[in-house]
A protein has these predicted regions:
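Outer-membrane beta-barrel and related beta-rich outer-membrane complex signature
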Residues: 33, 70-72, 113-115, 184-186, ...
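Short glycine/proline- and aromatic-enriched beta-strand/turn motifs that initiate or cap beta-hairpins
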Residues: 11-70, 252, 258-260
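Outer-membrane beta-barrel pore domains and translocons
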Residues: 22-28, 61-65, 90, 102-110, ...
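Outer-membrane pore/translocation modules
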Residues: 60-157, 240-247, 251
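Short glycine/proline-enriched turns and hinge-like loops at secondary-structure junctions
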Residues: 34-37, 119, 150-152, 168
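Outer-membrane beta-barrel transmembrane domain signature
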Residues: 43, 48-56, 94, 132, ...
Length: 261
């Protein structure tokens, strides 16, 4: 398998293809617990490596339900798509210190919903940056959404990879998710006291990932994650909510692999 992957990578160069399929016990999307049942997610990227000018490509992210819990609301397979152009750039700051940037303009599509209002499309801009170094890696994400989902989402945290044995490694990370008042309402719901949410942190998550790098082209991973809603008012609002996945704290996990050509 390794020889086949290397052959495919050499044939594609300077073009690239990355595929990451995974199964998760639950699905958290931009700080909101969207589904507390198993989901299948696939992330695909393809493009051209322009060397010093970065990597130009396109991305596609799709979500499928692995249960029939919401069969009356939407179809099971591929009911949520995200796609758009991407640009990745690595800026070397010093020996072993690199600022990694990932910028995208994407569209989110929902399909197969019985409710016509849910069969909608909206667009967004997003930037991800991480300061890769041998110690602790800080990272953040900013997303600005448009067309009916007008909100700003922000995520920031730190992670650290520890080698265990040869190609086996573990990566603990912690991050907070926040955004504008519109994003807060999207995540938490309406306040129980009738007041308007202000901008702020809505949740904090702790993640532990175990990975095995079989080759430069193939790796597998498993993770466990603890999701926690922050703030007394937010917890009260979620406790009073009729939303099917209204949980103030939730433990989830998943398995997957990463293929790079």
């Amino acid at each position: 398998m390794q020889s086949l992957a290397l052959a495919a990578a050499s044939l594609l160069s300077p073009f690239f293809l990355e595929v990451t399929p995974e199964v998760r016990s639950s699905y958290v999307s931009s700080g909101k617990l969207m589904e507390d049942r198993p989901m299948q997610i696939t992330n695909v990227r393809a493009g051209y490596d322009a060397g010093d000018f970065g990597r130009f490509g396109v991305r596609n992210w799709d979500v499928s339900s692995l249960t029939d819990r919401r069969h009356d609301a939407h179809r099971h397979a591929f009911y949520h798509f995200e796609f758009g152009p991407t640009w990745e750039y690595d800026l070397k700051l010093a020996e072993e210190w690199t600022l990694k940037s990932d910028i995208t303009r994407s569209w989110t599509l929902y399909r197969g919903f019985e409710n016509d209002a849910s069969n909608r499309t909206y667009s967004w801009y997003q930037i991800d940056q991480a300061l890769a170094n041998p110690y602790i890696v800080p990272f953040y994400r900013v997303r600005k959404c448009f067309r009916g989902n007008d909100y700003v989402y922000f995520k920031a945290g730190v992670r650290r990879r520890f080698g265990i044995w040869e190609s086996l490694y573990v990566t603990p990370s912690v991050y907070a998710e926040s955004g504008s008042s519109r994003n807060y309402r999207r995540v938490i719901g309406a306040r129980t006291d009738g007041e308007r949410w202000s901008d702020g942190v809505s949740s904090v998550s702790f993640r532990l990932e175990l990975g095995w790098k079989f080759s430069e082209n193939f790796s597998a991973f498993a993770f466990v994650e603890q999701y926690e809603v922050v703030g007394q008012a937010a917890c009260h609002a979620i406790s009073a909510s009729s939303y099917r996945c209204a949980h103030n704290d939730w433990t989830l996990g998943g398995i997957g692999c990463r293929l790079k050509f």
